[in-house]
A protein has these predicted regions:
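Short acidic beta-strand-loop surface patches of small beta-rich interaction domains
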Residues: 104-109
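Soluble, acidic/polar mature domains that operate outside membranes
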Residues: 170-172
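NTP-handling and nucleic-acid-processing catalytic cores
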Residues: 1-103, 174-211
Length: 212
């Protein structure tokens, strides 16, 4: 399901409505993003909204990731629990608030009434509270790809943790040199283009990641 929720804009009687499949993650929202070319929201950019039932203040920002054709065109941004939101957060220097424990329960960063709840139980309670306080707009059935863990068969929750990384960019210098010097050759040769595209865009390599 996808849920439509309205966020009140401070200092006015206006609301901005977002659509989300994971309403429980609103506990960790740090911005609302709209597309820079979306005229519907132009007047709202830079305004402050209050996260419903949470009470924390966040800003409406511009970012190209927001798709005017998807949902309402306005996105809640939760950098700690969504890969794309994390990238938006990095571009816009947003705060990162992790709201989950390693066992999928709500942690101490959320309002105390939700702390300790399982994420799906929290979803039910949050939706009820949003309806009771008239922040809930509607819900719709959708087809959505949901990732499951290979070992646990549980729904995967993006989650920030401390990890060890190898400097893959530094390692790639020698890896590129052996190809440019012809010490190593590709057959067929056109695969060298793919190799260099990978090497030239390589990122730090996580060497301590966990599989669930």
């Amino acid at each position: 399901k996808i849920y439509y929720i309205k966020y009140p804009i401070d200092g006015s009687g206006d609301f901005i409505t977002i659509a989300t499949t994971r309403p429980e993650t609103m506990l960790g929202d740090t911005a609302i993003a709209v597309n820079p070319n979306d005229k519907r929201f132009k007047k709202f950019v830079g305004k402050i909204v209050t996260i419903p039932i949470v009470g924390r203040k966040i800003k409406i920002i511009k970012d190209d990731y927001a798709d005017p054709e998807q949902g309402t065109g306005a996105l809640k941004i939760t950098p700690a629990h969504d890969f794309n939101d994390y990238e938006v957060g990095q571009r816009n220097d947003l705060e990162i608030i992790n709201i989950f424990t390693e066992s999928g329960k709500i942690n101490q960063n959320a309002p105390k009434e939700y702390v300790g709840l399982d994420r799906f139980e929290a979803r039910k309670i949050i939706l009820k509270e949003l309806k009771d306080k008239e922040f809930f707009v509607k819900e719709e059935n959708i087809k959505n790809k949901v990732p499951y863990g290979d070992r646990s068969n549980s729904i995967i929750e993006p989650f920030l943790t401390e990890q060890w990384f190898a400097d893959a960019k530094k390692l790639s210098i020698k890896a590129k040199k052996v190809v440019t010097s012809k010490k190593t050759n590709f057959f067929p040769e056109n695969w060298s283009k793919t190799y260099f595209q990978w090497m030239n865009n390589i990122e730090p390599w996580c060497i301590s990641r966990q599989l669930w």
